[in-house]
Amino acid sequence: MKKYLLFSILIVIATIAFAQKDRDTIPKYLKSPFIPAFKIVQTNGTNYTKDSLPAETPLIIMYFSPDCGHCQIQTKEMLDSMQYLQSATIMLVAYKKMEVLIEFSNHYELCKFTNIHIGRDPKYFLPSFFNVKFTPFIAIYNKKGEFVKAFEQGASVLEMRNYL
């Protein structure tokens, strides 16, 4: 009887141990190295999607938080050096409330820049896709829509322009 009980316990433990799946540690953006099918709601209320992107244009996606000091510094640096980033479409994406994004956009006068799109990711798709741990997170795609580089804690304009 003891042998039967011990054998049963071992079977249960083995079943539980082998039932555990290894967590997939490779982020989705590395598995699928092309621009994802995203949808953000811009501060003007319109949707901006992958299909909205201009053809043959590099893309910079910056996932940020408007109240993050590093994100504010990153934004200012990008705006001050826009001559180096003018050839790219820049998406500033956050999860915060739209009112906060509008305030951020107005503060930095983002509407002056035709290549910048700021909006909210209401489904939290992009941070999940990029496995964002810190903000600002920056992903760069080339003219063909192929993933080039990710910066997990922001990047200088010089670093970014090297990948455009």
Map each language-model feature to its residues:
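Structural microenvironment flanking redox-active thiols in thiol-disulfide oxidoreductases
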Residues: Q72-L110, F125-S128
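Short, internal strand/loop/helix patches
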Residues: Y108-A139
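Thiol-/selenol-based redox modules, centered on thioredoxin-like
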Residues: T57, F134, I140-L164
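Bacterial Sec-dependent N-terminal signal peptides
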Residues: M1-T25, L164
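N-terminal "domain-start" segment that seeds a small globular fold
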Residues: Q20-D51
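Short loop/turn microsegments at loop-to-beta-strand junctions
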Residues: I35-P36, L59, T135-P136
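Short active-site neighborhood of thiol/selenol oxidoreductases, capturing the structured segment around
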Residues: K50-Q72, M78
